[in-house]
């Protein structure tokens, strides 16, 4: 699973996901890509599940680039804990994804293989996505 080696602060505010993605919304490495159409937090487990699905489907052919990184810690309180007494401890990491953001890129394979592999990765994502070709 992806996570930062070290961060400046252990805990973060939740923030808001307004507007569309102005960065990371163009294909820069491969020829085919998966693009987000909705805003969401995508966990490191979901990113890894999508990556595994793509590599398994493409087998030895092609190269895959993961264009998002989970750099936001999500904190959780233990179950059956009373209110108050501070913020919970960091449990997992998420990538903040806005509409238009490229999630995965793929190159070195034919279009039908890429389309099949990327559709498998899309089924692992908690949002609507689209397949795009550069």
Swiss-Prot record:
Q: Does the keyword Electron transport apply?
A: no
Q: Carries keyword Plastid?
A: yes
Q: Which SUPFAM superfamilies does this entry report, sorted A to Z?
A: Ribosomal protein L16p/L10e (SSF54686)
Its primary localisation, in coarse terms, equals plastid
For this record, an example GO cellular component is: chloroplast
- Alphabetically list the UniProt keywords: Chloroplast, Plastid, Ribonucleoprotein, Ribosomal protein
What's the superkingdom here? Eukaryota
Enumerate the GO terms in the molecular function aspect: rRNA binding; structural constituent of ribosome
Any one Gene Ontology biological process term? mitochondrial translation
Compartmental location: Plastid, Chloroplast
One matching Pfam family, short form? Answer: Ribosomal_L16
SUBUNIT field: Part of the 50S ribosomal subunit.
Q: Its family?
A: Belongs to the universal ribosomal protein uL16 family.
PANTHER family, alphabetically? 50S/60S RIBOSOMAL PROTEIN L16, LARGE RIBOSOMAL SUBUNIT PROTEIN UL16M
The family database entries (NCBIfam families) matched by this protein are listed as:
rplP_bact (TIGR01164)
Stated name of the protein: Large ribosomal subunit protein uL16c
Organism from which the protein derives: Atropa belladonna (Belladonna)
């Amino acid at each position: 699973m992806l996570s930062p080696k070290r961060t400046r602060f252990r805990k973060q505010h939740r923030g808001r996901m307004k507007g569309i993605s102005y960065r990371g919304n163009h294909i820069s490495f491969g020829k085919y890509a998966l693009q987000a159409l909705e805003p969401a937090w995508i966990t490191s487990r979901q990113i890894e599940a999508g990556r595994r699905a793509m590599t398994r489907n493409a087998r030895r052919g092609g190269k895959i680039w993961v264009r998002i990184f989970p750099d936001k810690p999500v904190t959780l309180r233990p179950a059956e804990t009373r209110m108050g007494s501070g913020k919970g401890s960091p449990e997992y990491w998420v990538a903040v994804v806005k509409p238009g953001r490229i999630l995965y890129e793929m190159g070195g394979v034919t279009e039908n293989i890429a389309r099949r592999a990327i559709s498998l990765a899309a089924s692992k994502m908690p949002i609507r996505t689209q397949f795009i070709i550069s």
